[in-house]
Amino acid sequence: IVTDAHARLLTARDVLNRAEQAVGLRARDDVEHAQTGTSPVLLGPAVRSELIRLLIDVCPSEGWIGVCGVGDIGWEWASQQGMDLDRVLVLNAGKDHQVGDLCSLLIEACDVVCLDVPELSSAQQRTLAARARSMGRIIVTLRPWPGLSRDGVRQRMRLVV
């Protein structure tokens, strides 16, 4: 279902993309994926409205967002902000499931994966980060991954010229 707001958002993104290309600006996605040695793991904000904005901002147009273990998203508000809910996969993994394997599948299927999974070990976190880096994916985690996660809000505010 395409709402008027969503259609306007897509039109605006298309116009901005053409304007950026006309003046020689590179898309944020092109620059971030071109950087080497940076972690693909962002520490997401606790405030849900900021988290939704971050997910929308780091997801490429026509990209997919995967969510696992994150509660109280506020899907209606997310849709109003421009998140295409037809391109969102949600996994609610129980404690009996192989959570690391499920997160790995989300990384294979989605451009941006948002995780709030306390069951992941440090080794699983490193494996998921390496897989995300090799596939050009971004992980937004709501729990710090020592040595891997970086502040997502601060990264998003960087200007690319």
What are these regions (language model features)?
Residues 1-67:
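Detector for small/aliphatic-rich hydrophobic stretches
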Residues 33-35, 106-107, 133:
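Solvent-exposed alpha-helices and their adjacent loops that cap or buttress functional pockets
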Residues 45-46, 70, 117, 143:
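Fold-independent oxyanion-binding glycine-rich loops
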Residues 51, 100-101, 151:
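Short, solvent-exposed polar/charged micro-motifs at secondary-structure junctions
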Residues 57, 105, 131:
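Hydrophobic/aromatic ligand-binding patch that stacks against planar heteroaromatic rings
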Residues 60-64, 85-86, 132-139:
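Structural alpha-beta junctions
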Residues 64-128:
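Long, charge-dense
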